[in-house]
Amino acid sequence: MLQMLTLEEWAAEKYRSNPPSVSTLRRYAKQNLFCPPAMKQGRLWRVREDAELVGELVTPVIKKNDSLLLQRILSNGSQTA
């Protein structure tokens, strides 16, 4: 079973020298740039040991004139405002 590592532990394992700073890793975690995504547990962000940085994934543009059903689908099934 894969372990959940703190961002610092993950960076030390992935980068042999000159890892990103902790604040940069936290920003990446908040922006969902890890695959699988990082999870916040208490005060710490944790990622699976096999996690990778994937960069910005494309998100669909939701227009106000789109149908309500399409807006719901594009917003991951959550209710529209």
From Swiss-Prot:
User: Please, which domain of life does this record's source organism belong to?
Assistant: Bacteria
One function term, GO molecular function aspect? DNA binding
Q: Tell me yes or no: is DNA-binding among this UniProt entry's keywords.
A: yes
Q: Name one Pfam family in it.
A: Exc
Q: Which UniProt keywords apply?
A: DNA recombination, DNA-binding
A biological process term (GO) from this entry: DNA recombination
Q: Which InterPro entries match?
A: DNA-bd_dom_put_sf, Excisionase-like, Excisionase-like_sf
- Gene3D superfamilies (UniProt xref): 1.10.1660.20
Homology family: To lambdoid phages excisionases.
* Name under which the protein is recorded: Prophage excisionase-like protein
What is the species listed in this Swiss-Prot or TrEMBL entry?
Escherichia coli (strain K12)
Q: What is the lineage of its organism?
A: Bacteria, Pseudomonadati, Pseudomonadota, Gammaproteobacteria, Enterobacterales
